[in-house]
Amino acid sequence: MDHSLAKKIILDLCKHAFEDESIKLDVFGSIATGLALETSDIDLVVTGLKIEGRDDAISHIRTLKDHFEGCQYFSNIKAIEGASIPVIKLEADLQKLRENENSKNTSIVESEMRFLQIDITFEDSKEKKSDFFWEGFEWNTSKLHLGMKSIHLVKSYIKEYVHLKELTLCIKKLLSVRDLNSPYQGGLSSYGVIIMIVAYMNFFSLQNAWVNISQLLIHFFDFYGSKFEENKVGIMINRGG
């Protein structure tokens, strides 16, 4: 419910900021794939705006940031223009959202859950793009937003690889408690974790192995921590890992 309230207010702000009622707001990332922790942030993508290039995306980021700064529900608002896809990072105060929604009977949000981390990016949904997974990656494009495309890929992996979901959640939790889960600060993203696990399972033919999850976890860390030679080889999700 709190997530829906935050999304609704953000959508209203987007429509007001760009004076466009056709704008939509979609969820991608861990929330959409079912791989979210209790403390996971929400990844949102704004669609429906015409974006001709990176400069347009940055301009939209700045415009939206100004509108967020005037809203009492959001704080710690940052526009990261140098990211591969420009992004706004902010916190939503779920307690204030609840109080606004139901001022007469408002329950208290637990202190550690009160502030919801949200990332917002933009996608040009009015222009046809090539398919990343089936037509190849276009290295020279800065407009290609892969968040929505990756949802279907990750869900297919969860169905195909036994224990992928459990192993992903375990590793994400370990990264979270060590503050190593933010790629903007040198950490590892959820998608990066999934790619590493899939490559590992492919390499050792563990796609359908019904083994103890703890053994998989220990072997995973042993492989990447002790045996993987990052200066000689790379990580792939096809051709055996």
Predicted regions and their residues:
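Conserved catalytic core of two-metal-ion nucleotidyltransferases
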Residues: 59-133, 138
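Structured beta-strand/turn binding interfaces of compact recognition modules in eukaryotic regulators
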Residues: 26-30, 45-49, 80-82, 91-93, ...
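Basic, alpha-helical interaction scaffolds
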Residues: 137-190
